[in-house]
Amino acid sequence: MAEAKGKTDTRRGYFDVDGSGAMTELIFMLELSGPMAAFESDLIDGFNDMIARLREERSDLLVWLYEEAGKCMDFNTRVPITEDSALIEQGCFTRLSTLAEEYRRAHPEEFIHQDNVRGSGCLFDVGGCIHMAQQVYQTALPEDRPMRTMVIIVTDNTKIESESGDYWTPDRLRELVEQQEKEAGWEFVFLGTSINAKQVAEDVGIPAKNAATFACDAAGVRENFASLGVMILEFSATGVVVPTWAQKISEHLAKTQSGRS
């Protein structure tokens, strides 16, 4: 493995709290509940390959990882990228879906309202995750905060409800996102399939330039993480999201669409 190029952040916070010297925090929210379920292994392999490549270049990254399938979630928070828990275990999403279905069969009364009203709006679950990270950030001393934070959302959910009865309405989510962008300098990235990702992103306060629609096939799922890895390296070094970060994702989508026409 090549020597990591990341500089150690000598501020007291991260060096003393977890020994990672982390300067950049990456918050991944990965949802697999719809058409991408057939490509679970590609998502996991693509994500793990990205983490492995990032490790070769930088050791100063912290990873939050939220995995969701069938409204069942698992997560790790503030994991140094060098630790095994920054990776996803094979079969993770299948396990979550199975647990969710078992709970649903045992407690059907809890899902009546969701089935009739809520739909499958992925971003409402995202709101809770962002709020959790926000609370950690706000309660930390300034020297205990990362220099940069990026929130990366990858979903195959195709329905965004505006009248759901859920706390996280689009307006509330947009307020939360814009607050973190303005007050803390966070960057948000949104990748979605079978939806207009740029429009959905803008509806909740994420800049369209930080969003892309991807092809729901094995190559498209893997390309997400190949492109994200390159973009993350640039962001961790400069704090800038390059405008062309999603070019290969969009090119593959266009190729698959032209093949179907």
Region roles according to the model:
Residues 1-261:
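Acidic, low-complexity intrinsically disordered regions
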